[in-house]
């Protein structure tokens, strides 16, 4: 589990509750709970998001919320180490030996690439097939990101709509000045709900998925370059130096260690 994502959401919730209790007291917490405001804001935001995307992407977007808590199985340095290990196997035992090594791999993208080169597929065709799949994966990720970005935009918009509804009702009942304060407070709650939906949930989720997507795309590019280099019969050390160019300088030492471990296997 990615503890950082869970901690961020819970800390934000703590700050919110702390702020409310500090200003209004424990009993005043009820003042921030209004079912009608919640229905207008959340119902309107989710309904208009459904209008904006396909049903398939809507369902996939809702399900993707749990992905922010999933820790990556491998980082890019580990992936480079795995590819160097495979290159050593291919150099010692030949490309056909990679078919057996592929059975122990968990990543379907890497496994697919290995099976393509074991089958003797032309290198350009291997690249084309894998890059096409990479584009397809990135497209699905962008659809999910688009869902959360759309919902983030709809939340404050419907919060403002709810506030306007409350203000209209308040102005119609200005004959009783004692009701103006409470009516204004209720009207503003929808704006609060919309802002919370956008800035506490939707935008952080979207940003996390974008960050995870960038890491995954980099890893898949490393896989493509590494597998094509293995297919071309390049020296494992040359492959390692080539793939390390994907990493920032501070991470290249760990990649060296992974490569040395692979060479000793």
Language-model features: where?
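Helix-termination/interfacial motifs at the ends of transmembrane alpha-helices
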Residues: 7-10, 14-29, 135-212
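Large intracellular
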Residues: 4, 8, 18-144, 216-265
């Amino acid at each position: 589990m990615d503890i950082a994502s869970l901690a961020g959401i819970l800390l934000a919730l703590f700050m919110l509750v702390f702020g409310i209790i500090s200003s209004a007291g424990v009993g005043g917490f009820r003042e921030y709970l209004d079912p009608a405001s919640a229905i207008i804001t959340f119902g309107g935001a989710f309904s208009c998001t459904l209008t904006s995307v396909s049903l398939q992407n809507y369902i996939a977007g809702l399900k993707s919320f749990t992905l922010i808590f999933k820790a990556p199985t491998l980082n890019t340095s580990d992936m480079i180490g795995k590819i160097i290990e495979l290159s050593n196997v291919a150099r010692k035992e030949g490309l056909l030996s990679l078919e057996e090594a592929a059975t122990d791999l968990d990543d379907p993208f890497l496994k697919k690439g290995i099976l393509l080169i074991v089958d003797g597929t032309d290198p350009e065709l291997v690249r084309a097939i894998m890059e096409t799949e990479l584009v397809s994966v990135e497209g699905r990720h962008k659809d999910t990101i688009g869902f959360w970005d759309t919902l983030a935009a709809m939340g404050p918009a419907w919060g403002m709509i709810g506030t306007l509804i409350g203000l209209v009702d308040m102005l119609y009942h200005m004959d009783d000045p004692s009701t103006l304060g409470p009516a204004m407070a209720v009207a503003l709650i929808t704006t609060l709900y919309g802002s919370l939906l956008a800035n506490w949930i939707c935008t952080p989720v979207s940003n996390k998925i974008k960050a995870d997507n960038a890491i995954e795309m980099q890893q898949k590019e490393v896989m493509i370059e590494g597998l094509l280099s293995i297919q071309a019969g390049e020296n494992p050390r040359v492959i390692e130096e080539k793939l390390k160019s994907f990493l920032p300088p501070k991470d290249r030492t760990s990649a060296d260690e992974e490569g040395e471990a692979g060479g000793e296997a």
